[in-house]
Amino acid sequence: MKGSDALIMALRNMAATLGVYDLMEVRVFLERSCRFVQERYRAIYVDAYMSMVVDSVLDLKAGFSGTPEMDDARYSLRDALKRLDEINAPTIVGLTVLYRTYVKGEPLHPPGTPFPGGFEVEKKDGVHYCPVKDKQSDNPEALCDICIARQSPLP
């Protein structure tokens, strides 16, 4: 079994064990993680993240059958797991991060996510760009180092 197949199988098995309590736990985790986000963005972020979590779990429970987007140049899976452990991420957050990053090849902020200054996550020519990726390098709670998005070019 290839590593990517093993990852998908592990994520499917994790998703099969998740229930309503896990969704409540992740909501609390997200609200706590976003407590310093400007108020006008906080609800947008929490709702977007919750949507990603639910979509990821439902995809995996339905038996995602796409082609994994694993890329050797990305953050190593071992390092990603270590980072998730460092921030005490609930299992469901880890599942979502790993699924979106290593299986679907999607950024952790969906395209269209707004940021102060009128900037947002964008996808151009198949590449995702984030306006704040580099600015979050000193934030121990941020998972930007795992995210596939690149820093947006300066305007």
Swiss-Prot record:
Name of a matching Pfam family: DUF2115
Domain of life: Archaea
Similarity comment text for this entry: Belongs to the UPF0305 family.
Xref: NCBIfam families: PRK01022.2-5 (NF002180)
Protein name listed in UniProt: UPF0305 protein MTH_811
Species in which this protein is naturally found: Methanothermobacter thermautotrophicus (strain ATCC 29096 / DSM 1053 / JCM 10044 / NBRC 100330 / Delta H) (Methanobacterium thermoautotrophicum)
Phylogenetic lineage: Archaea, Methanobacteriati, Methanobacteriota, Methanomada group, Methanobacteria
